[in-house]
């Protein structure tokens, strides 16, 4: 399985870089995983609704340009469907079983994802109703993908 994680902005925090690198190393035994960063749109601290939409739309164009046409797209969205780790694992396994070898996860910037990206997605998931920094979501996502592969293969993983 080829998994692409498309994210907005550059990762700056050293502890996140190290954590993600560790899980990418572990994941290499199960799948080819790549992270693609697209530039975030510079914006003032306070934005009108129209300005927020404009920022998300510009970031959305950049995101969509990086997603392969034949990829199954999973957008991480606050209003997405919540799943347990076991459900997430089963869903990834089904994708592999039914020939979806390319999966693209999308993590938006601090304002979220554009309507165009949400429309392009095949599904939207949420890891909870908490608001987490989008950069931290990268680490959470790669950990959950790793956990999913361990669950599917019946391999032990601490709870």
UniProtKB/Swiss-Prot annotation:
SUPFAM superfamilies to which the protein is assigned, alphabetical: alpha/beta knot (SSF75217)
CDD domains with a match to the protein in the record: RlmH-like (cd18081)
Location(s), subcellular: Cytoplasm
Binding site for S-adenosyl-L-methionine: 76, 108, 127-132
Keywords: Cytoplasm, Methyltransferase, rRNA processing, S-adenosyl-L-methionine, Transferase
Main subcellular location: cytoplasm
GO terms of molecular function: rRNA (pseudouridine-N3-)-methyltransferase activity
Source taxon at top rank: Bacteria
GO cellular component, one term: cytoplasm
Recorded family membership: Belongs to the RNA methyltransferase RlmH family.
HAMAP family, per the entry: 23SrRNA_methyltr_H
PANTHER family, per database record: METHYLTRANSFERASE (PTHR33603), RIBOSOMAL RNA LARGE SUBUNIT METHYLTRANSFERASE H (PTHR33603:SF1)
Protein name, UniProt field: Ribosomal RNA large subunit methyltransferase H
Organism in which the protein naturally occurs: Listeria innocua serovar 6a (strain ATCC BAA-680 / CLIP 11262)
Lineage: Bacteria, Bacillati, Bacillota, Bacilli, Bacillales
Gene: rlmH
């Amino acid at each position: 399985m080829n998994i692409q994680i498309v994210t907005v902005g550059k990762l700056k925090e050293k502890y996140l870089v190290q954590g993600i690198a560790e899980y990418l190393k572990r994941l290499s035994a199960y799948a080819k995983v790549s992270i693609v960063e697209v530039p975030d749109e510079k914006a003032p601290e306070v934005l009108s609704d129209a300005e927020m939409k404009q920022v998300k739309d510009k970031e959305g164009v950049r995101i969509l340009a990086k997603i392969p046409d034949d990829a199954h797209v999973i957008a991480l969205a606050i209003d997405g469907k919540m799943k347990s780790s076991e459900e997430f694992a089963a869903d990834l396994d089904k994708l592999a079983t039914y020939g979806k070898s390319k999966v693209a996860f999308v993590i938006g910037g601090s304002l979220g994802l554009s309507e165009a990206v949400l429309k392009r997605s095949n599904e939207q998931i949420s890891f909870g109703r908490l608001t987490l920094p989008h950069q931290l979501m990268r680490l959470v996502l790669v950990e959950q993908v790793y956990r999913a592969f361990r669950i599917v293969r019946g391999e032990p993983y601490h709870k």
